[in-house]
């Protein structure tokens, strides 16, 4: 294909993309990715149209999910059909009070507008309904140079490792300040290093699939964003770390899906981030990093945990995660301070409108608290489907923690098949931990407000513990808590 034809092809694809992004009244059902067989356990239809139900079968506890894009608050009729009579069901978030109608093996219910939902039928595996808000990415991409990854003769079947070609496309597109577009396909790759002044746009059925060879990751991560400014990943496509689908079996441990450090002005919007071997996304020594409308799908084991955190803001400031769902085997939304040089503080962090499922903490500060200060940390509007600990501050190093808010939590269940009791509140300063630490910290000013427990509290504990008179916890205000 000559250069002229390639350029024309890119323009045509770009035009098609923009037309496809026009808002419509009917929901748009996202197509299958094609990397694994679809779910046989669940059949889902939306307004009478059959949806593709993905199955992450290689996780310790497999999950199923389908994606929809919805414009506005149009009512959607959801029908879920399974292979057995439905004896019980639950639709989370429970606070929305969604009631369905059961006839034999079919569950019918209605949702109004976008939202993230989990349907639990009998003792079956979880079904995630990911109903995304329509985002006008066309407006966000306006006036930028558009490059199609297919211009680089990339294999889109997932059978060939394409790291070098994709990296070349990233480097060349960044020099233009452009948008690198990934159309439908499976793109197998090792570590990719992002650049400043670049946007990646993932089509609905685009899948960036990590290699299962640990040697293809120089810095133990799939998406590496280091010393980068003005970078975005947009779209409803998927980035997969291949953690439980092969990378762990080949000896990989503690590989991030996304690792950003020394960055400024980073945006992720709409993408699915799934199956890392370790923390899904770590943001370190960075500022103005904002995640919106994310779907984070990690491994969650039957017992204990697997260090598969959701989103970790570490030694960073002015960052946020807004409107997300996180399925994780460890802590869901986390704030840390691993900067031992104490150059950075951790400040102005917001987590808002998040649906969580975890074997450990739903919302947490710590345990790594090496920075001088944590300030203005807010966890708001959190629906907790399952956790071991709901609200956590573990100050195990030397720091000062202030202006922390846990507000508008809806906790559906506490469950942890380990030895320790679950906890609603766990604020602790200590020098006794699984690692060497000092516990020379202070916590002063925590607001716990409007916390609603939607299950019984049998066996659930709470604790607020200082180390001593000097390193202690002060000014914790708890108001508006209910148990239903």
Where are the regions a protein language model picked out?
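Extracellular/periplasmic carbohydrate-active domains that bind, remodel
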Residues: 22-484
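Bacterial Sec-dependent N-terminal signal peptides
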Residues: 1-26
């Amino acid at each position: 294909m000559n250069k002229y034809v390639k350029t024309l092809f890119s323009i045509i694809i770009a035009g098609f993309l923009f037309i496809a992004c026009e808002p419509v009244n009917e929901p748009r059902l996202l197509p299958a990715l094609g990397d694994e067989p679809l779910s046989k356990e669940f059949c889902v239809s939306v307004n009478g149209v059959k949806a593709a139900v993905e199955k992450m079968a290689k996780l310790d506890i497999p999950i199923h999910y389908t994606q929809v894009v919805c414009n506005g608050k149009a009512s959607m009729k959801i029908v879920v059909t399974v292979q057995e009579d439905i004896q019980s069901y639950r639709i989370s978030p429970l606070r929305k009070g969604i009631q369905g109608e059961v006839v034999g093996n079919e569950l019918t219910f209605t949702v109004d507008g976008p939202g993230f939902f989990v349907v639990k039928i009998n003792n079956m595996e979880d079904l995630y309904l990911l109903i995304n808000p329509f985002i006008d990415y066309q407006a966000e991409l306006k006036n930028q140079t558009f490059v199609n990854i297919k211009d680089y003769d990339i294999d889109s079947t997932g059978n060939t490792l394409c790291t070098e070609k994709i990296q070349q496309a990233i480097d060349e597109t960044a020099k233009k300040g452009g948008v690198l577009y990934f159309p439908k396909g499976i793109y197998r790759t090792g570590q990719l290093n992002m650049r400043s002044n670049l946007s990646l746009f993932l089509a609905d059925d685009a899948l960036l699939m990590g290699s299962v060879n640990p040697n293809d990751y120089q810095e133990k991560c799939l998406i590496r964003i280091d010393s980068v400014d003005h970078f975005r990943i947009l779209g409803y496509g998927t980035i997969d770390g291949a953690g439980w689908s092969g990378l762990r079996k080949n000896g990989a441990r503690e590989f991030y899906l996304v690792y950003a450090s020394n960055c400024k002005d980073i945006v992720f919007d709409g993408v699915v981030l799934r199956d890392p071997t370790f923390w899904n996304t770590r943001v370190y020594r960075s500022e103005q990093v904002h995640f919106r409308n994310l779907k984070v799908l990690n491994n969650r084991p039957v017992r204990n945990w697997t260090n598969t955190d959701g989103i970790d803001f570490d030694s960073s400031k002015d960052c946020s995660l807004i409107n997300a769902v996180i399925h994780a085997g460890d802590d869901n939304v986390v704030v840390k301070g691993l900067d031992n040089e104490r150059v950075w503080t951790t400040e102005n962090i917001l987590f808002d409108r998040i649906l969580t499922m975890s074997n450990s903490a739903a919302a947490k500060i710590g345990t790594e608290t090496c920075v001088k200060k944590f300030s203005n940390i807010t966890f708001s509007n959190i629906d907790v489907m399952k956790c071991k600990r709901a609200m956590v501050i573990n100050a195990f190093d030397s720091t000062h923690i202030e202006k922390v808010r846990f507000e508008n939590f809806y906790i559906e269940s506490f469950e942890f098949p380990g030895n320790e009791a679950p906890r609603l509140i766990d604020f602790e300063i200590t020098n006794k931990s699984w690692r060497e630490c000092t516990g020379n910290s202070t916590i002063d000013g925590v607001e716990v407000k409007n916390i609603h427990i939607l299950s019984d509290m049998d066996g659930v504990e709470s604790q607020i513990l200082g180390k001593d008179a000097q390193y202690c916890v002060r000014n914790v205000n708890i108001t508006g808590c209910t148990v239903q």
